[in-house]
Design a protein with these regions (language model features):
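Short, glycine/charged-enriched secondary-structure capping and boundary segments
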Residues: 19-22, 53-55, 75-76
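A hydrophobic alpha-helix adjacent to the NAD(P)-binding/active-site core of NAD(P)-dependent oxidoreductases
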Residues: 49
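Structural micro-motif
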Residues: 52-62
Length: 92
């Protein structure tokens, strides 16, 4: 199974939406709960965050490949769709 790294920032409204979307998707699809997600707080773990190329949070990598990077103005529905793409890309 592939590993997901999700970079988030404390106080980021898009990151909050991504976490809510992740929880909603896991509630509705048990197989998503099997996918390991490492939620990395950029402001608390800069040593890890600095190793990756992104500008906006949330950003999600699947096995070191960037699959999703948020951008300003995204709606909850857009974020949920992107998080689901990441979860679908993760199973081996």
């Amino acid at each position: 199974m592939k590993q997901i790294k999700a970079f988030i920032l404390t106080g980021c409204p898009y990151c909050k939406k991504a976490r809510l979307a992740y929880n909603e998707l896991c509630e509705n699809n048990a197989s998503y709960r099997e996918v390991p997600v490492d939620w990395i707080l950029e402001d608390q773990q800069p040593d890890i965050a600095d190793q990756y190329d992104y500008y906006y949070t949330p950003t999600m990598y699947v096995d070191e490949q960037k699959v999703y990077e948020s951008h300003p103005g995204q709606t909850y529905e857009e974020i949920r769709d992107e998080v689901e793409k990441v979860l679908k890309a993760a199973p081996a």
